Amino acid sequence: VKVLVTGASGLVGTELIAQLRANGDHAIALVRRAAKNENELAYVPGGTAEQNVALDAAMKTAGAVVNLAGATTGKLPWTKAYKRELIESRLGVTQTLVDSMKRVGAATVFVSGSASGFYGDTGDANLHEDAPRGSGFLADLASQWESIALGAPKSVRTVLIRTTMVCSRTKGALGRLLPLL
Protein backbone atom coordinates (compact mmCIF):
# COMPACT_ATOMS: atom_id res chain seq x y z
CA VAL A 1 0.00 0.00 0.00
CA LYS A 2 1.26 3.48 -0.82
CA VAL A 3 1.05 5.68 2.29
CA LEU A 4 1.74 9.43 2.21
CA VAL A 5 3.01 10.74 5.56
CA THR A 6 3.41 14.33 6.77
CA GLY A 7 5.41 14.93 9.92
CA ALA A 8 7.65 12.05 8.92
CA SER A 9 10.70 13.56 10.61
CA GLY A 10 8.97 13.79 14.00
CA LEU A 11 9.06 11.20 16.75
CA VAL A 12 5.88 9.36 15.74
CA GLY A 13 6.42 9.87 12.00
CA THR A 14 9.93 8.41 12.07
CA GLU A 15 8.70 5.26 13.80
CA LEU A 16 5.64 4.97 11.56
CA ILE A 17 7.69 5.25 8.36
CA ALA A 18 10.10 2.56 9.60
CA GLN A 19 7.25 0.21 10.55
CA LEU A 20 5.37 0.72 7.30
CA ARG A 21 8.48 -0.04 5.28
CA ALA A 22 9.27 -3.08 7.45
CA ASN A 23 5.75 -4.33 6.66
CA GLY A 24 6.39 -3.93 2.92
CA ASP A 25 4.27 -0.81 2.44
CA HIS A 26 5.47 2.03 0.22
CA ALA A 27 5.76 4.91 2.70
CA ILE A 28 6.44 8.31 1.17
CA ALA A 29 7.42 11.21 3.40
CA LEU A 30 5.90 14.51 2.30
CA VAL A 31 8.57 17.15 2.87
CA ARG A 32 8.64 20.96 2.65
CA ARG A 33 12.12 21.01 1.09
CA ALA A 34 13.54 19.40 -2.03
CA ALA A 35 13.08 15.62 -1.96
CA LYS A 36 16.32 13.70 -1.39
CA ASN A 37 15.21 10.36 -2.86
CA GLU A 38 12.22 8.40 -4.20
CA ASN A 39 10.90 7.89 -0.65
CA GLU A 40 10.26 11.63 -0.30
CA LEU A 41 7.96 14.01 -2.12
CA ALA A 42 8.23 17.79 -1.93
CA TYR A 43 5.00 19.72 -1.49
CA VAL A 44 3.95 23.25 -0.56
CA PRO A 45 1.66 23.44 2.50
CA GLY A 46 -0.90 26.14 1.83
CA GLY A 47 0.23 26.22 -1.80
CA THR A 48 -1.86 26.29 -4.94
CA ALA A 49 -2.82 23.33 -7.10
CA GLU A 50 -0.11 24.42 -9.55
CA GLN A 51 2.49 24.27 -6.76
CA ASN A 52 1.31 20.81 -5.71
CA VAL A 53 1.08 18.90 -8.99
CA ALA A 54 3.38 16.17 -7.63
CA LEU A 55 1.26 15.85 -4.48
CA ASP A 56 -1.88 15.47 -6.58
CA ALA A 57 -0.21 12.78 -8.70
CA ALA A 58 0.84 10.84 -5.59
CA MET A 59 -2.58 11.31 -3.99
CA LYS A 60 -4.26 9.63 -6.97
CA THR A 61 -2.50 6.34 -6.21
CA ALA A 62 -2.20 6.51 -2.43
CA GLY A 63 -4.05 3.98 -0.32
CA ALA A 64 -3.72 6.05 2.84
CA VAL A 65 -2.62 9.47 4.04
CA VAL A 66 -1.27 10.01 7.55
CA ASN A 67 -1.06 13.62 8.70
CA LEU A 68 1.29 14.07 11.66
CA ALA A 69 2.55 17.53 10.76
CA GLY A 70 2.91 20.24 13.33
CA ALA A 71 5.52 22.19 15.23
CA THR A 72 6.19 20.76 18.67
CA THR A 73 4.05 21.97 21.55
CA GLY A 74 6.99 21.17 23.83
CA LYS A 75 8.93 24.29 22.85
CA LEU A 76 8.62 27.18 25.26
CA PRO A 77 7.79 30.00 25.53
CA TRP A 78 4.69 30.19 23.39
CA THR A 79 5.18 33.66 22.01
CA LYS A 80 2.68 35.13 19.57
CA ALA A 81 5.02 34.16 16.75
CA TYR A 82 5.37 30.58 17.99
CA LYS A 83 1.62 30.22 18.45
CA ARG A 84 1.26 31.33 14.83
CA GLU A 85 3.75 28.59 13.85
CA LEU A 86 1.78 26.00 15.85
CA ILE A 87 -1.36 27.03 13.98
CA GLU A 88 0.10 27.31 10.47
CA SER A 89 2.10 24.08 10.70
CA ARG A 90 -1.11 22.15 11.37
CA LEU A 91 -3.94 23.93 9.62
CA GLY A 92 -2.16 24.79 6.37
CA VAL A 93 -0.82 21.26 5.90
CA THR A 94 -4.17 19.66 6.65
CA GLN A 95 -6.02 21.98 4.27
CA THR A 96 -3.47 21.24 1.53
CA LEU A 97 -4.03 17.48 1.92
CA VAL A 98 -7.81 17.81 1.96
CA ASP A 99 -7.76 20.10 -1.09
CA SER A 100 -5.61 17.58 -2.98
CA MET A 101 -8.01 14.75 -2.08
CA LYS A 102 -10.91 16.82 -3.37
CA ARG A 103 -9.13 17.67 -6.63
CA VAL A 104 -7.94 14.22 -7.66
CA GLY A 105 -9.85 11.62 -5.75
CA ALA A 106 -8.67 10.38 -2.49
CA ALA A 107 -7.01 7.67 -0.54
CA THR A 108 -9.21 5.13 1.21
CA VAL A 109 -8.12 6.28 4.67
CA PHE A 110 -7.05 9.65 6.05
CA VAL A 111 -5.51 9.56 9.53
CA SER A 112 -5.07 13.06 10.84
CA GLY A 113 -3.37 14.19 13.99
CA SER A 114 -5.04 16.21 16.67
CA ALA A 115 -4.28 16.69 20.34
CA SER A 116 -5.62 15.71 23.73
CA GLY A 117 -5.54 19.46 24.31
CA PHE A 118 -8.92 19.36 22.53
CA TYR A 119 -10.45 18.69 25.96
CA GLY A 120 -8.77 21.62 27.70
CA ASP A 121 -7.81 21.44 31.37
CA THR A 122 -10.31 19.07 32.97
CA GLY A 123 -8.39 18.32 36.15
CA ASP A 124 -8.68 14.69 37.21
CA ALA A 125 -11.82 13.95 35.20
CA ASN A 126 -11.89 10.72 33.22
CA LEU A 127 -12.46 11.56 29.58
CA HIS A 128 -13.77 9.61 26.63
CA GLU A 129 -13.47 10.58 22.99
CA ASP A 130 -17.01 11.92 22.97
CA ALA A 131 -16.28 14.38 25.80
CA PRO A 132 -17.00 17.99 24.84
CA ARG A 133 -14.36 20.35 23.57
CA GLY A 134 -12.62 22.37 26.23
CA SER A 135 -11.41 25.95 26.15
CA GLY A 136 -8.07 27.61 25.65
CA PHE A 137 -5.48 27.90 22.90
CA LEU A 138 -4.84 24.15 22.41
CA ALA A 139 -8.55 23.31 22.49
CA ASP A 140 -9.21 25.96 19.85
CA LEU A 141 -6.31 24.75 17.71
CA ALA A 142 -7.27 21.07 17.94
CA SER A 143 -10.88 21.88 17.11
CA GLN A 144 -9.90 23.88 14.01
CA TRP A 145 -7.44 21.15 12.96
CA GLU A 146 -10.11 18.45 13.25
CA SER A 147 -12.68 20.56 11.43
CA ILE A 148 -10.38 20.92 8.43
CA ALA A 149 -9.56 17.19 8.41
CA LEU A 150 -13.25 16.31 8.52
CA GLY A 151 -13.63 18.29 5.29
CA ALA A 152 -12.04 15.37 3.42
CA PRO A 153 -14.29 13.76 0.81
CA LYS A 154 -17.06 11.64 2.34
CA SER A 155 -15.74 8.59 0.47
CA VAL A 156 -12.61 8.71 2.65
CA ARG A 157 -12.60 7.10 6.08
CA THR A 158 -11.26 9.93 8.23
CA VAL A 159 -9.71 9.05 11.58
CA LEU A 160 -8.68 11.70 14.10
CA ILE A 161 -5.98 10.76 16.62
CA ARG A 162 -5.84 12.91 19.74
CA THR A 163 -2.35 12.32 21.04
CA THR A 164 -0.72 13.73 24.12
CA MET A 165 2.97 14.18 24.85
CA VAL A 166 4.88 11.37 23.14
CA CYS A 167 7.82 9.92 25.04
CA SER A 168 10.83 7.97 23.80
CA ARG A 169 13.88 6.59 25.57
CA THR A 170 16.12 8.03 22.86
CA LYS A 171 14.45 11.21 21.58
CA GLY A 172 12.54 14.23 22.76
CA ALA A 173 12.44 15.55 26.31
CA LEU A 174 12.51 12.13 27.97
CA GLY A 175 15.42 11.01 25.80
CA ARG A 176 17.41 14.02 26.98
CA LEU A 177 16.51 13.48 30.65
CA LEU A 178 17.06 9.72 31.02
CA PRO A 179 20.87 9.84 30.77
CA LEU A 180 20.85 12.25 33.71
CA LEU A 181 18.98 9.83 35.98
Tell what function each PLM region has.
Residues 3-23:
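N-terminal Rossmann NAD(P)H-binding glycine-rich loop of SDR-like oxidoreductase domains
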Residues 25-32:
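Conserved glycine-rich Rossmann-like NAD(P)H-binding loop of the short-chain dehydrogenase/reductase
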Residues 153, 157-160, 164-181:
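NAD(P)-dependent short-chain dehydrogenase/reductase
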Residues 134-159:
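Active-site Tyr-X1-5-Lys
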Residues 83-85, 94-136:
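Conserved Rossmann-fold NAD(P)-dependent oxidoreductase catalytic core, especially the SDR/UDP-sugar
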Residues 15, 19, 100, 148:
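Rossmann-fold NAD(P)-dependent oxidoreductase module
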Residues 35-96:
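NAD(P)H-binding glycine-rich loop region in Rossmannoid oxidoreductase-like domains
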Residues 6, 30, 68-69, 110-116, ...:
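SDR active-site strand-loop-helix element
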